Amino acid sequence: MKKFMDDNFLLSNDTAEELFHHYAKDMPIIDYHCHLSPKEIYMNKRYSNITEVWLYGDHYKWRAMRAAGVEESLITGDANDYDKFMAWAETVPKLIGNPLYNWTHLELQRYFGVDEILNKESGPSIWEKVNKCLAQDDFGVRELINQSNVQVVCTTDDPIDDLSFHQMLVEDDDFSVKVLPGFRPDKAIEINQEGFIDYVDSLEKVTSHSTKTYDGFLRALKSRVDYFHQNGCSVADHALNTMMFTETTKEKARNYYEKAMNGQKLSPKEESDFKSFTLVFLGEQYADKGWVMQYHINALRNNNSRMYNNLGPDTGYDAMNDEVISKPLVNLLNELEKKDRLPKTILYSLNPNDNPVIASIIGSFQRGGVPGKLQFGTAWWFNDTKSGMIKQMQTLADIGVFSQFIGMLTDSRSFLSYPRHEYFRRLVCSLIGEWVHNGEVPYDLKSLGEIVQDISYYNAARYFDFGLLSDE
């Protein structure tokens, strides 16, 4: 029997252990997609207790607590922070098999030196130990990032954001980690959502372009791409909950934009025409700038209307969608490829049934001279588990080129989430170790170690324009 979460946690055999400890463990982290606050990084936010770090915005934990029968007052309600923490401590033992169980203990070990198992009995002492650490001078969020060996943090930012905190971080010589903006124009794409007209008005205010017309709207978006580019952005991201694409014309998109601006809802076909033309336009801008484009596909969001009305979005009431993505996704990518303006692209689906679909689609759009131009993104959200990560990597290896994989990201709102990179790297090493053990791959530690380091760091460092490998 193995010890609980020891140095060889998740490592399947001796080869996996060698690969992790000698090649993967100490590689820097490139967190190319997350939801951290640039303001909190600039201000070097400090936390007064562990509940603030763990439970104030983590809908993963909120869902688990609800499923365990915890009252909402102890999750998002007005209970005090100690009681909320103890509710989480009592929930954790019930989560065996869930990555939250391992992530929780990894975070306790790595940041606070706590090796105890979190439960109802240990909760009070762990509360005291962790809060004592958080009170120390070296436990601001900057120190947590530095302690995690992070080189780049890419935040998620709306086109109308002024990026002032990113700008101040560039000028701050006391913090060497690159904190770069990520362009997320969802509110400009979701034309049927309530608030679209108000958002477009806000877009006009931060640009010199009137958004009363569709042409002006596109010029305003382009100007924000330019502004983000000037401020170090080289990554865009889209939440495409429903994957749709129709071959259309600018005239049709213009007509439907005007219809929406007059307060009318668009039909599904009209919405698809608007989104299709606008997404192609934005993809062209990204290609011209040398950006990386990310599509997060097939999420079914805000399913519980009663709780959505009480708490709003991103509070733990989302699920996997099961809509067909292959044809609209291929047609969208092909439209950009026909114009020779398909940017580097990362595709994620929340539905694991789409894994072989995406892995095969990216192979249709690869191009010589750009290794892994299209990427099958790492297991996302509900798939961000041991089995989900292994399935994603195994599918990529089955159909594509595993050695070109750009690896892990946190996609997190927590400054304690970086051990997820360690969790991922352990699984990479374990998977390769099993291939060696089964005689599928030769035991060539140098070659395999290079692949592990590439997936852990170097592939992403080469893929993104972050200026990390100036000697290459």
Curated annotation (Swiss-Prot):
Q: What Pfam families does this protein map onto?
A: UxaC (PF02614)
Keyword match Hydrolase = no
Presence of keyword ATP-binding:
no
EC nos: 5.3.1.12
Keywords attached to this Swiss-Prot or TrEMBL record, sorted alphabetically, are: Isomerase
Output the Gene Ontology terms for molecular function: glucuronate isomerase activity
The UniProt catalytic activity note for this protein reads:
D-glucuronate = D-fructuronate; aldehydo-D-galacturonate = keto-D-tagaturonate
- Which Gene Ontology terms describe the biological processes this protein takes part in? D-galacturonate catabolic process; D-glucuronate catabolic process
Organism's domain of life?
A: Bacteria
**Pathway, per UniProt?**
Carbohydrate metabolism; pentose and glucuronate interconversion
NCBIfam families given in the database record: PRK02925.1
Task: Please give the family membership noted in the entry.
Answer: Belongs to the metallo-dependent hydrolases superfamily. Uronate isomerase family.
Q: What is this protein called?
A: Uronate isomerase
Which organism's genome codes for this protein? Oceanobacillus iheyensis (strain DSM 14371 / CIP 107618 / JCM 11309 / KCTC 3954 / HTE831)
Annotated gene? uxaC
